[in-house]
Design a protein with these regions (language model features):
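Conserved serine DD-peptidase/penicillin-binding transpeptidase domain
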Residues: 1-147
């Protein structure tokens, strides 16, 4: 894609009203085995959150894949300090949010896979963001986004 001359749109009309499979319930989120289903998926509707310890009592390194500004990361972890408590990687799923929070002790590298709320929006938002980062030419000056 070199440029967009009109509206960039994504059609998710192939989705029915049941975005969780039969037998699944609201409390199965934010786990990766139960992503929100959509015809548009990126990384199975999930984010891989990898943490690695740094120097004792400092913030651990957090890397999320795929990288996107669709979600936020709050790093409250502590490196190599058992008094910080058990490592916990989660998102604010009860409020249907996409704020990923790392807390507790990080004593060794670890990766957790979390689903994101509204995987179709995650796909399209990340797609458009990557187009813009590649300096996609927009004609006219604005590129409307419809989902």
């Amino acid at each position: 894609i070199r440029y967009v001359t009109d509206t960039l749109a994504a059609d998710v009309s192939m989705t029915d009203s049941v975005y969780w499979g039969s037998g699944w319930c609201w409390d199965d989120t934010p786990y990766s085995f139960q992503p929100y289903l959509s015809p548009l998926m990126l990384n199975r509707g999930c984010v891989d959150v990898s943490v690695s310890p740094a120097q004792k009592d400092s913030l651990p390194q957090v890397v999320c894949t795929p990288a996107s500004d669709y979600y936020q990361v709050h790093n409250h972890g502590v490196s190599r300090n058992p008094q910080a408590g058990k490592l916990k990687i989660t998102r604010n799923w009860l409020s249907n949010g996409n704020i990923i929070t790392v807390s507790g002790n990080v004593s060794y590298p670890y990766t957790e896979k979390l689903n994101v709320y509204t995987s179709k929006d995650f796909f399209f938002h990340t797609f458009v963001s990557r187009l813009r980062s590649k300096e996609l030419k927009r004609e006219p000056a604005r590129m409307p986004i419809v989902l």
